[in-house]
Design a protein with these regions (language model features):
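Hydrophobic faces of well-ordered beta-strands that scaffold small-molecule active sites
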Residues: 3-6, 32-34, 63-67, 90, ...
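Short glycine-enriched, charge-decorated loop/helix-capping segments at active-site entrances
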Residues: 49, 105-111
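Short, solvent-exposed amphipathic alpha-helical segments in soluble enzyme
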Residues: 21-25, 81-84, 211-213, 237
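Alpha/beta enzyme core
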Residues: 24-27, 79-90, 94-99, 104, ...
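Active-site beta-loop-alpha junctions enriched in small/polar residues
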Residues: 8-10, 37-39, 68-70, 95-97, ...
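Flexible, glycine- and charge-enriched loops at secondary-structure boundaries
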Residues: 110-114, 177, 262-266
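Alpha/beta catalytic cores of nucleotide-metabolism and tRNA/nucleoside-modifying enzymes
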Residues: 3-4, 9, 130-131, 149-163, ...
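Glycine-rich, positively charged N-terminal anion/phosphate-binding segment
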Residues: 8-81
Length: 337
């Protein structure tokens, strides 16, 4: 099963992707999806967007740019620009639940207009500008009800999409409630296009359960799980080795204590977060802004490392780089075995 990293706006930019690849990915992430660029008629692309899609910032890893648009002309302009940069695959964002996005009928909001979405896909995928370009969609299963997904899947099935990445939540769920595996199971049975699963794969037991229940899906996309529980990719790789040789040439993988970081895990995490801070300082206009960027990452790390509230509180409340580093030092010094 192929492994993808999900695009998390403001988190999995090129600095994060490159650091993650060095310390964790190591060629085992089949695709890194770039957080969406949003083409518009007047403003052009932001500095962040331009930096994120720059080929020199993505050397050595397989990245797929994501576009958020509901205007076929703007989408095709963005696709042409990405093609010139050397990209051969793009992804359409039909999943972002943000209110400001949805109010403009983009992201998950586009799902509320299935007729317009159908016309959009027809014009985009029949355009000569899409020659030699693959296009996938990352979609939720509706705006308010999973029943909406039956029509949406019928629409997707009419077009030569390279894959459909399904997050089985509706827009009104945001990230609450549980993914609806019944609607996902239905979609897997209906689709003639490769299907990828996205949603709440946080620990190895979540991945194992998915693979056991859906052994024939093409890939799984993981976002928050990789940001906060980076060694999950190592556990997935170990599990794959064990399954490949039926355990005959490999010690049985034991994930009984998968919540516990050992000394090697801690050393790797320390190097990873250290590189992130260094690289953010190198591209941002102040150390304080780089520190705030790191705090976003630590919010996710905190979710997978309970029992260390004192260190996390110091990190969260730090007002300068020295305070931040003291909090980080307390976390690592208190965890190393």
């Amino acid at each position: 099963m192929k492994i993808y990293m999900a695009p998390l706006e403001g988190v999995t930019g090129y600095v994060f992707r490159n650091a993650f690849e060095e310390y964790y990915g190591k060629g085992r992430i089949d695709k890194y999806f770039i957080p969406f660029i949003s083409p518009n008629k007047s403003k052009g692309y932001t500095t962040r967007e331009q930096a994120d899609i720059a080929p020199e910032h993505n050397a050595g890893i397989n990245v797929v740019p994501q576009i958020m648009a509901n205007d076929e002309g703007l989408f095709l302009e963005a696709a042409a620009m990405l093609k010139e940069l050397g990209y051969s695959e793009i992804n359409l964002n039909l999943g972002c639940p943000s209110g400001t996005v949805v109010s403009k009928y983009r992201g998950a909001g586009f799902l509320a207009k299935p007729r317009e979405l159908d016309i959009f896909l027809d014009k985009v995928l029949s355009s000569p500008q899409m020659k030699d370009m693959r296009m996938s969609v990352k979609t939720r299963t509706g705006m308010e009800s999973h029943e909406e997904f039956k029509l949406l899947m019928a629409i997707y099935g009419d077009y030569p999409l390279s894959e459909i990445i399904i997050h089985p939540r509706v827009r009104t769920d945001y990230y609450k409630n549980s993914p609806d595996m019944d609607i996902f199971r239905w979609a897997v049975g209906e689709s003639g296009v490769p299907i990828s699963y996205n949603g709440d794969i946080f620990k190895i037991k979540d991945y194992e359960k998915l693979v056991e229940e859906f052994p024939d899906i093409d890939s799984v996309m993981i976002g928050r799980g990789f940001v906060g529980n980076q060694r999950l990719i190592n556990q997935i790789a170990d599990l794959s080795i064990d399954n490949t040789d039926n355990g005959q040439n490999h010690d049985k993988v034991d994930f009984t204590h998968d919540d516990t970081l050992d000394k090697h895990d801690m050393e790797t995490l320390e190097k990873f977060t250290g590189r992130l801070l260094k690289d953010y300082i190198g591209i941002m206009d102040s150390e304080v802004n780089a520190m705030h960027k790191m705090k976003e990452v630590w919010i996710y790390i905190n979710q997978f490392n309970p029992g260390h509230e004192k260190a996390f509180k110091k990190i969260k409340k730090s007002r300068n780089l020295t305070d931040y580093q003291n909090g980080v030092r307390e976390f690592f010094d208190g965890r190393k075995i």
